[in-house]
Amino acid sequence: MKRRLAFLLSIMLLAGCTKQTANSSSTSNTSTSSTNENSGGCAAFAECESSEDEAKLYEDLLTAHNTPFEKATMEDVVSYFENKESHILFLGFRDCPWCQDLMPILNDIAIQKNIKIKYVNVRPENTKESDLRNENNPTYVKLQELLGDVSGDGTNKIYVPYVGVIRDGKVVDFMLNLDYDAHTVQITESQIEEYKTRLNELLEK
């Protein structure tokens, strides 16, 4: 189980860490990252699993009394575009280890900035079989068109975590995760600081 930094985990006590430290030199830029689920994000139906303690922390942040996260559906997100609304969007799921690393950082920054974030759980039943990123799901196909080439490989596949800024029904900018294997390595302090910098810049747009 990964050891979280104290300032991010004041609400919980976790056991020792069994992961190695991530290489902080392996990163992605603001709008791109690796599309390999073993090094940079969870693909649709990929084996992305974590401990129950990690998953519980993720869910606790979503349901805290002061949470900045507002639950939404893919259908809701499509309507934001169609109605030319402005929102901050976070796509993820509880067992995605990269989502778990990003969540407390995004949570703290959103609270500091008094920003609400629309959260879409792409695996509502917490299983890979329930993943909504299915090419047979017309809402997902529509969302792919609206978000554009998120993965940077021309496939329009959506990897998580995904944080995007929608202004007047258009994607202004977005951020994926840093490029490291969150299944086996612990996020470093320098990577946490990089996440903070990028998120602060993104949420100002």
What are these regions (language model features)?
Residues G154-K205:
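Non-catalytic, surface beta->alpha helical segment in thiol-disulfide oxidoreductase systems
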Residues Q100-K113:
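Typically the conserved alpha-helix immediately C-terminal to a functionally engaged Cys/Sec
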Residues T18-Q20:
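Bacterial signal peptide processing site
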Residues M1-R4:
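Positively charged n-region of N-terminal signal peptides that target proteins for export
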Residues E82-R94, L106:
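Short active-site neighborhood of thiol/selenol oxidoreductases, capturing the structured segment around
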Residues L91, I115-K142:
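Thiol-based oxidoreductase modules, predominantly thioredoxin-like and allied folds used
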Residues S26-K84, E194-K205:
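N-terminal leader/targeting and pre-domain segments
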Residues L13-G16:
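C-terminal motif of bacterial Sec signal peptides marking the signal peptidase cleavage site
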